[in-house]
């Protein structure tokens, strides 16, 4: 299912300001994109790009591109967000690799 509303940029700014405050207190905050069904990801690409760009502009980017977590539709159950067991294993492996790549292990 594609996103149907434009991202609420003011809400993203509120979120990124909170992240910055946490970081100022020495708290490590890591943003990983959610899992997407590939069809939904492709239909929502402009929205996802807008969110990603806003996060980057606020210096609170995702650790990896959201496309990394766009999985074939067959790895999802009844929604574009509910991964199957195989999809969960794949995402877990990617999360571990992504955290390792930034020195979190």
What are these regions (language model features)?
Residues 1-68:
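Conserved, well-ordered alpha-helix/loop/beta-strand core segments that scaffold catalytic motifs
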Residues 42-45, 52-105:
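C-terminal regions of proteins
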């Amino acid at each position: 299912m594609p996103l149907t509303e434009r991202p609420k940029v003011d809400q993203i700014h509120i979120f990124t300001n909170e992240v910055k405050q946490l970081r100022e207190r020495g708290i490590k905050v890591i943003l990983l994109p959610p899992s997407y069904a590939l069809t939904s990801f492709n239909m929502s690409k402009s929205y996802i790009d807008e969110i990603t760009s806003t996060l980057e502009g606020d210096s609170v980017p995702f650790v990896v591109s959201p496309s990394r977590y766009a999985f074939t539709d067959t790895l999802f159950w009844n929604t574009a967000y509910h991964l199957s067991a195989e999809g969960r294993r794949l995402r877990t492996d990617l999360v571990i690799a992504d955290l390792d790549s930034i020195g979190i292990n």
